[in-house]
A protein has these predicted regions:
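Iron-sulfur cluster-binding cysteine motifs and their immediate structural context
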Residues: 7, 172-196, 202, 213-240
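Glycine-rich phosphate/pyrophosphate-binding loop
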Residues: 245-246
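A short, flexible beta-alpha/helix-coil linker loop
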Residues: 158, 199-200
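Long, well-ordered alpha-helical scaffolding segments within enzyme catalytic domains
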Residues: 164-169, 178
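Auxiliary alpha/beta "docking" domains used to position bulky ligands
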Residues: 1-166, 205, 214-215
Length: 246
């Protein structure tokens, strides 16, 4: 675990306890134009459907840089996108981990925000953090400013325990969301989310959404910026994920 500077924890490979919530989210159309989310949702909620014989899910977290104030007149880009593309970097970390595990045999399959894996469910189960009202995984040290990578394995590993939810009665993310996209129960209506419209959506942005975008160019980050757990700088951020002035 010392190889992974932000966090490395293990969850049991179990069916998602939030499977029914996912199905309801899809039925409500809250996935907007992300049609891949609606493909084989049952497979997405069960690691054994992705990797037969899966017994454990290893979750890696990797911090990205702290929020910085920017003049309102400047176009804003979400915090995580200021550094290098995290996919390739975390895939290298997964490859290192797979090489270590190969000593013990078994089969492994890794994903970085790209496969039919409910990584936030696994991250919550193993105590990487708790699920905030915004749907993001939040930690007491570092808030929600981190990427998640998952490695499914057929090896039986000792699981870590979940942590207590630290949101309490706070609803800042939901109350200050510029479009009311945060439902406050850990779910987001992507059809209202500015990150969806400025990152995931392909095509023209609806006229009723355009005035709400303001100076945002890519992403939103309001829910990240207003979260009390994100107030302190992160001391040990990989230089590749440091913010730079574009």
């Amino acid at each position: 675990r010392v190889l992974f500077r932000s966090g490395c924890r293990v969850a049991r490979a179990e069916k998602s306890p939030h499977a029914e919530k996912l199905f309801q989210w899809l039925e409500r159309g809250w996935h907007a134009g992300m049609e891949w989310m609606a493909r084989s949702p049952e497979r997405r909620t069960d690691p054994a459907e992705v990797l037969p014989g899966c017994r454990s899910v290893i979750c890696l977290s990797y911090d990205y840089d702290s929020p910085g104030r920017r003049p309102e007149r400047e176009g804003s880009i979400c915090l995580y996108a200021h550094g290098k593309d995290y996919h390739g970097i975390l895939e290298e970390k997964l490859a290192d981990l797979q090489e270590l595990l190969s000593i013990y045999g078994g089969k492994q399959k890794g994903y970085v925000d790209s496969g039919p894996v409910m990584e936030r469910d696994h991250a919550e189960a193993c105590g990487l953090g708790w699920r905030g009202k915004s749907g993001l995984i939040v930690r007491r040290k570092g808030g929600s400013r981190f990427f998640i990578a998952t490695l499914l394995t057929t090896l039986e590993l000792e699981p870590d325990a979940p942590v207590a939810n630290g949101c309490g009665s706070c609803r800042r993310c939901a109350a200050l969301c510029p479009t009311g996209a945060i439902m406050g129960n850990g779910q987001v209506d992507a059809g209202r989310c500015l990150s969806y419209w400025t990152i995931e959506h392909r095509g023209a942005i609806p006229e009723e959404i355009r005035p709400l975008i303001g100076t945002r160019l890519y992403g939103c980050d309001t829910c990240v910026m207003v979260c009390p757990w994100n107030g302190k700088p992160l001391p040990d951020v990989d230089e590749r994920f440091r913010m730079s002035r574009l």
